[in-house]
Amino acid sequence: MHDLIQGWTHFQSGKVRDLYRDADGEILLVASDRISAYDWIMPTSIPDKGAILTKLSLFWFEKLSGITPHHVISSEVPATVKGRAIICKPLTIFPVECVVRGYLAGSGWAEYQTNSQVCGVPLPGGLLDGSKLAEPIFTPATKAAIGYHDENISLDR
């Protein structure tokens, strides 16, 4: 299920990423090609998805490095995971997923149907599943374990 990487011990897998630890306590974060949608891992994968996710992450960590510190130590990783992994400092995880929505769909649509808002952000009446929003909205969610659904949370929480 997970890679065997010399010098690294697998200790956790998420929906899309696998985590390994070395003797010094550093973390190897490996992005897989797994697909996760609606909080479930799909049976198929997307070739090179892990490499693309890693490149996107590195781009944003570099872009924001003058604004905020991050956990990345290096992108120089073992050859078996080159291009789809980073070495990181161990941190305490804040289990919140940051979602920016441009369209009303998924859990946002479900919440809207009950109270005409998503994560405490009021939206106009009459929207339909898949409606384009006038402007993107920030809708954080809890980061649930595999097999459980993330839950939208209000910005007031």
Where does each model-flagged region fall?
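Active-site loop/lid in soluble adenylation, ligation, and acyl-transfer enzymes
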Residues: M1-I146
